[in-house]
Amino acid sequence: MTASTILQRLARTIEARKNADPSISYTAKLLNSSQDKVLKKIAEEAAETIMACKDNDREQIIYETADLWFHCLIMLTRHDISPEDILRELERREGISGIEEKLSRSQPNKTE
């Protein structure tokens, strides 16, 4: 099973939870909460991932990153963005220098 397959399956499950009962589904509860609540949860999970990295704790890095990705998928679902949209963007960037890509974003359009 590929990573993209797992992400797609998880995204479908999250999408299906949009209409689930928030009193029995954590995912439905987050999907039906305010955007700020979801964003705070992402910030919390990002901080926990950072702390696991600082501690050089491989197992915790994996665990916390999984939490972070899960909550990011919830955020993406709320904005009707699929994992495939993100994977396409990563594919588009493949082989492009990060410095070069950033410079292209800051250059004004010369045709104007």
Curated annotation (Swiss-Prot):
Its EC number is 3.6.1.31. It holds the Pfam family PRA-PH. One of its GO terms (molecular function) is phosphoribosyl-ATP diphosphatase activity. GO terms for cellular component: cytoplasm. Keywords: Amino-acid biosynthesis, ATP-binding, Cytoplasm, Histidine biosynthesis, Hydrolase, Nucleotide-binding. It catalyses: 1-(5-phospho-beta-D-ribosyl)-ATP + H2O = 1-(5-phospho-beta-D-ribosyl)-5'-AMP + diphosphate + H(+). Belongs to the PRA-PH family. This is Phosphoribosyl-ATP pyrophosphatase. It comes from Nitrosomonas europaea (strain ATCC 19718 / CIP 103999 / KCTC 2705 / NBRC 14298).
